Amino acid sequence: MMETKKFCLTEKQMPTQWYNIVADMPNKPLPPLHPGTKKPVTKEQMSAIFAEELIDQEMSTERYIDIPEEVQEIYRIWRPTPLVRATGLEKALGTPAKIFFKNESVSPAGSHKPNTAVPQAYYNYKQGIKHLTTETGAGQWGASIAFAAKHFGIDLQVFMVKVSYDQKPYRRLMMNTWGAECVASPSTLTESGRAALERDPHCSGSLGLAISEAVEMALRRPEDTRYCLGSVLNHVVLHQTVIGQEAVTQMEMADAEPDMVIGCFGGGSNFAGIGFPFLRKNFAEGKKIRVIAVEPEGCPKLTRGEFQYDFGDVAGFTPLIPMYTLGHDFQPSDIHAGGLRYHGAGSIVSQLMKDGLIEAQSMPQVETLAAGVLFAQTEGIIPAPESTHAIAATIREALKAKEEGVSKTILFNLSGNGVIDLYAYEQYLAGALKDFSPSDEEIRKTINQLEHLI
């Protein structure tokens, strides 16, 4: 009998609410602190940076938050996204495991990022904001918020981490096509950028530094400009839960329940998007689903960092955030998974990790790109370098099931496609790709610098 390959929902089955996991967490995340007073930040203090309704969502403890119809209308351009059985990959591995993936690469920008870009642009538009600033690593977020900002007639300035700016010129052109201005970070447009270039004229940049530049620029024009962020914060991961909510329904359609749910990890948005609705099943129904975050060995905040208060950016413009961190001055190696080159984890994910409710693994770069090639050859989609981390972890788990002779059901999130990341694949296929892993001394040096913050 022919097995179903794709499990698709109708637009009427699309989620109409976002799921806020804070309502179900046994231990709530610690509050962000004002770096001067060391007291919890207030809505008023955050309002110079973020739109007011986004701040309300950031601080909310309500389990569900309605998705505005205007946002749902744009979501329907690409949502619901397919759930796919990776039968080709299963056959290639010779595994008894059943492998499913949620295909977020079908969005206009090619990744999961528009799930939060659209509501962020919408709430800023509602508030009368005319200009937005943001950072981007690999460019998936920058392209997504450019798409969303153009839809609502908002100007956008993007600071793109220099190593990715150089590696991925076509994603920069996507931003330009949607009307955004994009510059390499560090830049000469801000004090933060100029200071970084003075310290190191050849600085390849980091997400933390790009955030500093974007926040600094937003603070110059509080009357009509705000900052928006593509990961880490509570309201961002909230918006991404449309992924997992759809996947819960689709797995039921497939008459399957995952033993484990896997997502790559940079700041937490796609991991939370796929994982949090399944954690809800653990909390509410007593399930034992493993939820696994997979980060690069070159930027291992969950597996080798420490849980501390730290800045979300290099210059210290953000509140102090409770997070697993490598230290905001940590300079990641120039891995191709630019979207995962962030020093810290969001406060919700960090608290879940601290409480042992999720797991974390780190993956070497060469293994992840090898997994990406195998996936492309067996399932047809060239995955983004970020997504290959989830694929590599899935392959490890599937081969482990084969060795043990047990049937496991694995779900991972394909967070984006890699058709504009082909330089990474060129390097891999040429045998020129290298693994990077910071030394204990490097990590200890930047973590020790946090002692004075609290």
Enumerate the predicted regions with their spans.
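Positively charged, low-complexity intrinsically disordered leader regions
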Residues: 3-129
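Active-site/ligand-binding loops adjacent to catalytic centers
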Residues: 64-66, 190, 196-235, 243, ...
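Active-site nucleophile and cofactor-binding loops and adjacent substrate-binding regions
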Residues: 103-114, 132-141, 233, 262-267, ...
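A short, small-residue-rich loop immediately preceding and capping a beta-strand
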Residues: 116, 124-163, 257-271, 291, ...
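Alpha-helix C-terminal capping segments
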Residues: 119-129, 143-155, 176-177, 275-285, ...
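Active-site-proximal loop->helix
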Residues: 141-204, 301-311, 422-430
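Claisen-condensing/thiolase-fold acyl-transfer catalytic domains that form or cleave C-C bonds
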Residues: 265-269, 273, 365-431
